[in-house]
Every structure is written in structure tokens, then in C-alpha cells.
């Protein structure tokens, strides 16, 4: 068993990707835009210039930062009362804690939103470190946010699990040198990430079972 585990947040810990897609669609409909099928996959787990390019591509706006800020503010408003957990999250966190694995969240979301979601969901006490990639120059699929998280945990990346739901996130975890586990949400695993060594689980409960069995 590894000594550290680094969790993505949206779509992995919390069932929030559907909320974000709902908000993006509402903003699109208000502008008379129909989002293509690829939007959910492209927008997931991106930040920085990559995020801006996706917003411009689908919304044809000259102010992608302003639109993203509006989406985030609406998400904050809706998540203040309740943050839905993905099945198996509590069981996995309890298991890792019982086995003295140190835990971090590493998300592309702004730090205030990460902390708010952890607090509202009552998951905050589980985590030793909370890392945001929102201000990094290089976002996923670059490994920077996970390398930062491993450094904050004072562990080599090779002694950490990364748990992700998106292709970009998985590629970032693999590039960081972590044992990377994908639990798909909107994105299905590709042959590329399988060939690069990503582990695929259908749920967080399966992650726990396979760690317990010594597979990871």
C-alpha cells in the first residue's frame, strides 16, 4: 500500500460534474447556443488557457474568464447547502485513514471552492493537504498539481496514489509518476492511458477492494 493518496474533487469525490454541466447548459441556452456532445469531455478538469480555449470554442465569447467566473459563482451558490458524495467515498476515506495513508485533494477548482465543498460535505477532517491548480501556469494533463501535492505530503510521487475521473487528470497523474487510478464519470478510459499504466475501477468501492487485496 502506498503512503499517500491524492484525490481529484469534481466527478471523483463529489457528484458535481452534472451540476456544472447543467449550469453550462443554462448559460448556453440563455445565449441561444446548443452545446455539442464533446463539451462535457473537453471542459472537464481543465484550467488556464486550455479552459479559455474550450469556452471560446463553444460560446464564441470574447470574455471567457468573465463567463467562467459567472459559472463558478452559480456553482458556489448551489453547493452551499449540499455537496453530493460519490458512492464509496466515505468507505474509501475511512479505510485509507485507518491504514495511516496521508491524504490530499488536488483539484483545478479555486481553493475557496475546494475548501467550501470539503466543509459542507464534512470531508475536510480526512485531508492533510488541499491543493488548487487554478493558478498554475500548466494545468492537467501536465503533472504540476500532483507534484505539488506529493511535495506537500512530503512523499515521493511513486509512493502516492492519484485518483481521477478525467483523461487529462489521469495523464497528469501518470506524468507525475504516481500510481494512477481512474474511476470514470463523463470520460471513458482510452487505450492510451491503459497502455501507459492507468488502473481502471468502476467505483470508489472497487478502489478500496483492490487496494485491500494488494492489487495497487
What is the meaning of each model-derived region?
Residues 1-3, 94-97, 110-216:
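Asp-based, Mg2+/Mn2+-dependent phosphohydrolase catalytic module
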Residues 9, 42, 102, 131, ...:
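Short glycine/serine/threonine-biased micro-segments
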Residues 104-105, 182:
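Hydrophobic beta-strand core positions in alpha/beta domains
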Amino acid at each position: 500500500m502506498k503512503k499517500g493518496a491524492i484525490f481529484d474533487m469534481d466527478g471523483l469525490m463529489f457528484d458535481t460534474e452534472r451540476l456544472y454541466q447543467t449550469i453550462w447548459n443554462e448559460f448556453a441556452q440563455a445565449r441561444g447556443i446548443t452545446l455539442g456532445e464533446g463539451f462535457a469531455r473537453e471542459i472537464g478538469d481543465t484550467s488556464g488557457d486550455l479552459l479559455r480555449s474550450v469556452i471560446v470554442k463553444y460560446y464564441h465569447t470574447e470574455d471567457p474568464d468573465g463567463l467562467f467566473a459567472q459559472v463558478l459563482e452559480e456553482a458556489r451558490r448551489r453547493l452551499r447547502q449540499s455537496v453530493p458524495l460519490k458512492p464509496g467515498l466515505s468507505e474509501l476515506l475511512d479505510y485509507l485513514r485507518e491504514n495511516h495513508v496521508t491524504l490530499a485533494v488536488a483539484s483545478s477548482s479555486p481553493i475557496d471552492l475546494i475548501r467550501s465543498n470539503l466543509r459542507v460535505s464534512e470531508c475536510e477532517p480526512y485531508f492533510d493537504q488541499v491543493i488548487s491548480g487554478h493558478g498554475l501556469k500548466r494545468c492537467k494533463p501536465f503533472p504540476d498539481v500532483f507534484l505539488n501535492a506529493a511535495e506537500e505530503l512530503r512523499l515521493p510521487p511513486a509512493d502516492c496514489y492519484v485518483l481521477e475521473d478525467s483523461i487529462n487528470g489521469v495523464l497528469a497523474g501518470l506524468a507525475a509518476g504516481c500510481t494512477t487510478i481512474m474511476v470514470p464519470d463523463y470520460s471513458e478510459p482510452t487505450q492510451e492511458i491503459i497502455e501507459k499504466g492507468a488502473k481502471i475501477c468502476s467505483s470508489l468501492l472497487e478502489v478500496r477492494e483492490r487496494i485491500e487485496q494488494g492489487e495497487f
